[in-house]
Amino acid sequence: MVLRQLSRKASVKVSKTWSGTKKRAQRILIFLLEFLLDFCTGEDSVDGKKRQRHSGLTEQTYSALPEPKAT
């Protein structure tokens, strides 16, 4: 009986620490992806102007493409 209770407490503790580890790993992954995104949006080699910075992975806005000219 006591052994069963200790086993349950141990499994709860492991699951709590595992969920914390997963959250920490997700935060690190998001940080690295945002860092790479900022690194890759350097100067544009065509006109020498800096590209527009993104505010984050979840808040990207894209401008509409220009309408094709009628010929």
Swiss-Prot record:
Compartments, as annotated in UniProt: Host cytoplasm; Host nucleus membrane; Host rough endoplasmic reticulum membrane; Host cell membrane
Extracellular side: 45-71
GO MF, one annotated term: channel activity
Top-level taxon: Viruses
Main location group: host cell
GO terms for cellular component: host cell nuclear membrane; host cell plasma membrane; host cell rough endoplasmic reticulum membrane; membrane
Membrane topology classification: Single-pass type II membrane protein
Residues in the Cytoplasmic compartment per record: 1-27
Similarity remark: Belongs to the polyomavirus agnoprotein family.
Function: Alters the structure of the nuclear envelope by interacting with host CBX5 and disrupting CBX5 association with LBR. Involved in the perinuclear-nuclear localization of the capsid protein VP1 during virion assembly and maturation. Plays an important role in the release of progeny virions from infected cells and in viral propagation, probably by acting as a viral ionic channel in the host plasma membrane. Allows influx of extracellular calcium ions in the host cell. May contribute to viral genome transcription and translation of viral late proteins.
Name of the protein described by the UniProt record: Agnoprotein
